[in-house]
From Swiss-Prot:
Span of domain ABC transporter: 6-246
Assembly information from the UniProt record: Forms a stable energy-coupling factor (ECF) transporter complex composed of 2 membrane-embedded substrate-binding proteins (S component), 2 ATP-binding proteins (A component) and 2 transmembrane proteins (T component).
Protein name: Energy-coupling factor transporter ATP-binding protein EcfA2
UniProt record similarity statement: Belongs to the ABC transporter superfamily. Energy-coupling factor EcfA family.
Disulfide-bond pairs as recorded: none
UniProt keyword list: ATP-binding, Cell membrane, Membrane, Nucleotide-binding, Translocase, Transport
Pfam families, per the entry: ABC_tran
């Protein structure tokens, strides 16, 4: 499902003394099936941009086109209901979205709300609980008796239960330890491929953006500063530093090695695996002297 922002502006508390412009002149397209990371310094407009993707916020001016749906300032909330089925949002702490007596009821809530028969909703719950890495035994339990990591997976299953075509992730690994973070990101990447989703990841982690995204959108002061592949966006560390961002540690190492040995390393070095291979090739060609 293609996503297009056309001259989007968003002003909080418009037409009041407290008016604050959060987005202006945002023009960007996300192709169907892409995995796109949105990065930017705190206050850059990332989260405001995200909330336009399923109509939680509507543009003050301009339009957001998501598939055949168009969101403008004139849309009524009821008109956005079909869109919210197509666009699933996983917030920073998705476990805070849990509220039902059992895990099964929580996962079934969304589908039942959209008219899915109860037996079909329960079948989906059984399928999804396994998809997010939990056993069916969990379905009968209270979500509040689970560990934090398990609760997060249950909440994600609830989002997936509506079978969204677009999955929006707002810092979904916040508060997790490194191992939990990696497991969660790998799960999202697997879901992206298996379900053929359009995935939009809002993140502060340049490493996650480099490793998983096909494209990166860089936000700065409420507008799109840059948009391209990870290799393109991380090519100029100084420009990113000027807007308060850094490149991944692997890219820093690559640039230091190029400067030290006066060579060009063809690999983008976006992941540890790419970097290890590039270093091995470099030292097989370069003689190192004290």
């Amino acid at each position: 499902m293609d996503i297009v922002f056309e001259k989007v502006e968003h002003v909080y508390n418009a037409r009041s003394p407290l008016a604050r412009r959060a987005l202006y002149d945002v023009n960007v397209a996300i192709r169907s099936g892409a995995y796109v990371a949105v990065v930017g310094h705190t206050g850059s407009g990332k989260s405001t941009l995200l909330q336009h993707l399923n109509g939680l916020l509507q543009p003050t001016s301009g339009a957001v086109k998501i598939g055949e749906e168009t969101i403008t300032s004139h849309k009524r909330p009821k008109q956005l209901k079909p869109l919210r089925k197509k666009v699933g949002v996983v917030f920073q702490f998705p476990e805070h979205q849990l509220f039902e007596e059992t895990v099964e009821k929580d996962i079934c809530f969304g589908p039942l709300n959209f008219g899915v028969p109860e037996d079909e909703a329960k079948r989906k719950a059984r399928e999804l609980i396994k998809l997010v890495g939990l056993s069916e035994d969990v379905l009968a339990k209270s979500p509040f008796d689970l560990s934090g990591g398990q609760m997060r997976r249950v909440a994600i299953a609830g989002v997936l239960a509506l079978e969204p075509e677009v999955l929006v992730l707002d810092e979904p690994t916040a508060g997790l330890d490194p191992r939990g973070r990696k497991e969660m990101m790998e799960m999202f990447y697997r879901l992206h491929r298996e379900k053929q989703l359009t995935t939009v990841l809002v993140t502060h982690s340049m490493e996650d953006a480099a490793r998983y995204a096909d494209e990166i959108i860089v936000m700065h002061e409420g507008t799109v500063w840059g948009h391209g592949t990870p290799e393109e966006m991380f090519r100029d560390a100084d420009k990113l530093a000027a807007i308060g961002l850094s490149v991944p540690e692997t890219v820093k190492l690559k640039q230091q090695l190029e400067k030290r040995f006066g060579v060009v390393i063809p690999s983008p070095c976006l992941t540890l695996e790419q970097t290890a291979e590039a270093i091995q090739q470099l030292f097989s060609k370069v003689s190192v002297h004290d």
